[in-house]
Amino acid sequence: MMNRIILIGNGFDLAHGLPTSYADFIRGYNITLKLGLLEGEYERYDGLCSVNISDPEDRKTLEQFRWMLQDNTFRFIRNLGEITPAEQYDHFVSDHLIYESKFFETINKAVESKKWVDIEGEYYSLLKKVFKDKSCKYGDPIQLNEELELIKGALTGYLKSVQKHYIKSELRNPDIEQIIHEP
């Protein structure tokens, strides 16, 4: 029998410039959602958020942002005193975004306001409220735990994408990966 060692939170990945912070995960989730809309994915539901662009006028508005897919320089456009096209698109998406997970909304808002988030801390805070505060968003911990599982699944998918795009395949050892990912 082989013992497993899993290093969590050692900072090695961040020290080497890998986008593996929780804030990176939230930004990655939002980018994927926004790119999906630009690519014609008018409906999305994953348990964390949902977007439905069904109104023909909204779809026309969305079409006006399609050029961003082809033009990598749009990020650098700065109109003094005006909202940039990227900011206009962010507002458009925000107007159509519905948080299906209160917990995911909480961590998204933390990233927006503080530029970082402590998912474990936010979870623990909400878990304590379940038992202490009658006006808590959650009646019992079951829904909160289910939402945590959805977030863990999305985070795992994001980290696999980071591994695929940022870590050279010759540096990965399939035997170690199998040991890490086995139950």
Model-derived segments and spans:
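Gly/serine-rich nucleotide phosphate-binding loop at the start of the catalytic core
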Residues: 1-183
